[in-house]
Amino acid sequence: MLTYPNIDPVAIHLGPLQVHWYGLMYLLAFLCAWGLASYRAKQRDGWTSDMVSDLVFYGALGVVLGGRIGYVLFYEFDKFLENPIWLFQVWTGGMSFHGGFLGVMIAMLFWCKKYQKTWFQTLDFIAPCVPTGLMFGRIGNFIGGELYGRAVTDPNYPFGMIFPTDPLHLVRHPSQIYQALCEGLLLFIILWWFSSKPRPRMAVSALFLMGYGVARFVMEFFRQPDADQGFILFGWMTKGQILTVPMLLIGLWMMWYAYQKKIYDWGPQKNS
């Protein structure tokens, strides 16, 4: 069994100002996305550093607003009704990937209108940069001791740990780390490799939806369902799995459509 590194959720104390690890992870996520997108822009025609900076800014707004609103609507609407101010207390945790995803989709529409880019051209460009942000987000969940995994059934399982935030003090899967590795690092490697060569329009976005859909669906089997949600469908499907199934199906259709149409709207690489 591993020992949980009980880290102070406040990373930096600056007098009355407290910088939480959760917020710091979001900052690192956006900086990493900006760096990766800037690198991709240098490899392709039609993209500038100003466009990338604006793209990340729009995306950050979509993630924060959509993620928080989505979490409230999908998971904690009753809590919001009791205390509407809680919606704005982002530093306490509570963000939904699916809400953040929808928020980014909407934000990209405004960015595309400003820069006269097609929606899928933009999504294909930024999709490989997203998984690193997911990775940092899950690390933030781990440090905060939230969204931990289900209880370990094998007493000899070497990676189980007891989270101090768990009222039952059971040995559990560190599912946040599993998700950081699968939905984050592994998906990033796959998407970065796939997008390094010319692909049909929508193909990279489709692979993101498929890859995240599969990874999230599998990881939910290790993650403890929210106490007020439990298993919603068939006695074993969680809210996260239900919300992920449409992403997977849409991704499959998009990949099929992309290779049926074979429209290549990416500019040639500058260094080729």
Curated annotation (Swiss-Prot):
Keyword list, A-Z: Cell inner membrane, Cell membrane, Membrane, Transferase, Transmembrane, Transmembrane helix
Q: Which GO terms describe its biological process?
A: lipoprotein biosynthetic process
Identify the domain of life: Bacteria
Tell me which residues bind a 1,2-diacyl-sn-glycero-3-phospho-(1'-sn-glycerol).
Answer: 138
Protein purpose? Catalyzes the transfer of the diacylglyceryl group from phosphatidylglycerol to the sulfhydryl group of the N-terminal cysteine of a prolipoprotein, the first step in the formation of mature lipoproteins.
For this protein, what is the EC number?
Answer: 2.5.1.145
Q: Which GO terms describe its cellular component?
A: plasma membrane
Any Pfam family the entry gives? LGT
UniProt pathway annotation: Protein modification; lipoprotein biosynthesis (diacylglyceryl transfer)
Q: Where in the cell is it found?
A: Cell inner membrane
| The family this protein is said to belong to | Belongs to the Lgt family.
MF terms from GO for this chain are: phosphatidylglycerol-prolipoprotein diacylglyceryl transferase activity
Q: What is this protein called?
A: Phosphatidylglycerol--prolipoprotein diacylglyceryl transferase
TM segment ranges: 17-37, 55-75, 90-110, 125-145, 174-194, 202-222, 230-250
Membrane topology (UniProt): Multi-pass membrane protein
Q: Which InterPro entries match?
A: Lgt
Query: Organism source for this protein?
Result: Acinetobacter baumannii (strain ACICU)
